[in-house]
Amino acid sequence: MPIWSPKGRAAAGVVASVLFIVFFFLPLAVILMSSLSQQWNGILPSGFTLNHFVNALHGAAWDALLASLTIGFCASLFALLCGVWAALALRQYGVKTQKWLSMVFYLPSAIPSVSVGLGILVAFSQGPLQMNGTLWIVLTAHFVLISAFTFSNVSTGLARISADIENVASSLGASPWYRLRHVTLPLLMPWMMSALALSLSLSMGELGATMMIYPPGWTTLPVAIFSLTDRGNIADGAALTIVLVAITLLLMMKLERIAKWLGQK
């Protein structure tokens, strides 16, 4: 049965729906039930309570939320700035040079985050750029891990902008700086906002590298969730997970809506 036939498409849709329910919806539903239950000793939880969410919005958990938002926005904005600059700079080179330089930007995404964290920890624990024990080392790790995705989004958007538009602006006497500010960047803005949304969601959920380098006072939500569940406090960890998922989804939806609005202007 070919996949492009009506029956094939219907079967593929059913399989995709089942896989989505089994591997995404059900685990998330279990986490939600755990966060709302007083105890879970049998097949299903017993009792209903919001105390776990109250705990998730106070004290150390609240500090972890603020730390995740601060690190996520700072690292994402810096990655976006560098991604735009790199994508614009690569346009000046030939196809082969662009291919090899792009591989350099994509390389961090192919390396396990734990390896990135260890490398940054070793590299910046001594010497003139010592950042161990500071916020900067966490920002550096997050920037390295998300920069490839930002660069990819911006490069895709830049490739879809016709060179004729910029050529027309140049023929009308626009300087390179004026052309960048008033032609290229406005057209590129939807992809920039999409890149920001993606990088922010990746930063908010990063755990592997952060576990190795985070300093006191900058515990992120994933680290806090891991610590709670590692101590056996599953319910509070589940509540904090729901908070993380909800905030990340809301931020992504808002940024994607802004990107869609900018694309229609």
UniProtKB/Swiss-Prot annotation:
GO terms for cellular component: plasma membrane. InterPro entries: AminoethylPonate_ABC_PhnV (IPR017661), MetI-like (IPR000515), MetI-like_sf (IPR035906). The chain crosses the membrane at residues 13-33, 69-89, 104-124, 131-151, 185-205, 233-253. The keyword Cell inner membrane applies. Gene3D superfamilies: MetI-like (1.10.3720.10). It comes from the Bacteria. It is found in: Cell inner membrane. Residues 65-253 form the ABC transmembrane type-1 domain. It is a multi-pass membrane protein. Keywords: Cell inner membrane, Cell membrane, Membrane, Transmembrane, Transmembrane helix, Transport. Its main location: membrane. GO terms for biological process: transmembrane transport. Probably part of the PhnSTUV complex (TC 3.A.1.11.5) involved in 2-aminoethylphosphonate import. Probably responsible for the translocation of the substrate across the membrane. NCBIfam families: PhnV (TIGR03255). Belongs to the binding-protein-dependent transport system permease family. This is Putative 2-aminoethylphosphonate transport system permease protein PhnV. It comes from Salmonella choleraesuis (strain SC-B67). The gene is phnV.
